[in-house]
Amino acid sequence: MIMQDIRLRLEPQHSKATFISSSSASSSSSQTAETTLIETAEKSPASEAAAGTVTTTSPQHFFHHHHPPAHPHPPRQQPHPHSHSHPHPHPQLQRRPVEQLHLLHSHHDVQELSGQEHPHPQPGSHPHPHHLRSPSSEEDNSPTEMNNCRRLVDKPPLVKRLTMGIGLLRGTEDSRPLMHSTCGSSLTSGSGCGSTQTISDGYVNEAICEPDKYVASKFGDSCRQSLSALESATQRLQVELPAASKKYLRETCSANSSPKLFPGHSALRLDNLSLAEQQELKGAAWFQAGIPREISLEALSRQSPGAFLVRQSSTKPGCFALSLRVPPPSPRVAHYLILRTQRGYKIKGFTKEFSSLKALITHHSVMPELLPVPLTLPRPPSTRSQRSQGAYAGGTGNGGADFEMYGSLNDFRKMMADLNV
């Protein structure tokens, strides 16, 4: 049987295809055909072959050239006796890199691979003939210095420090990766901890940093402002109320929440009262600013109707509360809110306004207005002692006059109540 060795050579100057076929006698029991496909970087041939048929490519079209065995071309080169042929590119084709795609060993392989197209290689690429790898895989697997630097940048600072080594690049910014998360990358820029920080082997001593800047760098400006507001409130209250007990609580756990001040039950807050009003109410037995609501209920429940106390409101800051003992049909103790107005004070729901708390209480002790009962002013403790001394001395003391004045006011109140004025 005739074996055909067909080789395709492309001439870059004439663009012609030369077919070289060699015939030799072989054993009649085996029919094999060796076909070597050579593709230039600019043209992609289709590997379609049949018995005695080779498909070649032109710049635009595919042509099928049939060469009968009766008229073989004279061979220019004897085929190599080995089973595998290793073609060498022509010297004129050095400018066009040639890639050997596949070596067909038998006629059966040619028929199986007919109709399949090989991928077009990119111009200028020189892949290995036996190991074809993509540029991305080669770039990832290549141990170049550029890839190492790129991987080190993507890692966290601490992992980056451990990867590079303790003593590697010491004295540069990469040898101090933890400075960026604490106090900044520059020591003399004025940001972060300032110029007095100490660096030991790339790590910053955070104990000597300023608290405000350290908190701002760690938790943000909102937390720093919250702590600053808390410190200012503490200093202000320590100056104004040094003996009062204070308790600080935070409503939420977030850094944006502002600190809240909740006073104790015994705290005395007279910020909304002037000094004259404080001196005026200092000797009043019915004014108990710091008494809580529960204690006022317990104290007034054992008194007769008309007994009252004025305390500071626990629900409305800056306002006062009037706790009044009322007759039995109603609840034992009723609470009225005393509001602060531009003119002074008034009871919520009432129309009349008064210049001071004492004037308001004095008026409602005589004229109950909308209260269920008039306010009963408590007798001062000094009145009883002076009354006993005056009675013992024959009524010549000043205590008797004060007692008589207090009694006349009560009589006047009763008379006005009877007249329903």
From Swiss-Prot:
May interact (via SH2 domain) with Egfr (when phosphorylated). GO terms for biological process: negative regulation of epidermal growth factor receptor signaling pathway. The keyword Nucleus does not apply. CDD domains: SH2. GO terms for molecular function: receptor tyrosine kinase binding. Involved in the negative regulation of the Egfr/Ras signaling pathway. During wing morphogenesis, may function redundantly with PVRAP to inhibit Egfr activity and prevent uncontrolled cell growth. Disruption phenotype: RNAi-mediated knockdown in adults does not result in a visible phenotype. However, simultaneous knockdown of EGFRAP (CG33993) and PVRAP results in the development of ectopic sensory organs in the notum and blisters in the wings. RNAi-mediated knockdown in the posterior compartment of the wing disks, increases expression of PEK. It comes from Drosophila melanogaster. Detected along the wing margin, with high levels of expression in two stripes of cells on either side of the dorsal/ventral boundary and lower levels of expression in a small region at the anteroposterior boundary (at protein level). High levels of expression along two parallel stripes of cells on either side of the wing pouch dorsal/ventral boundary, and slightly lower levels of expression in a region either side of the anteroposterior boundary. Also expressed in discrete regions of the wing imaginal disk outside of the pouch. This is EGFR adapter protein. Residues 62-89 have a biased composition (Basic residues).
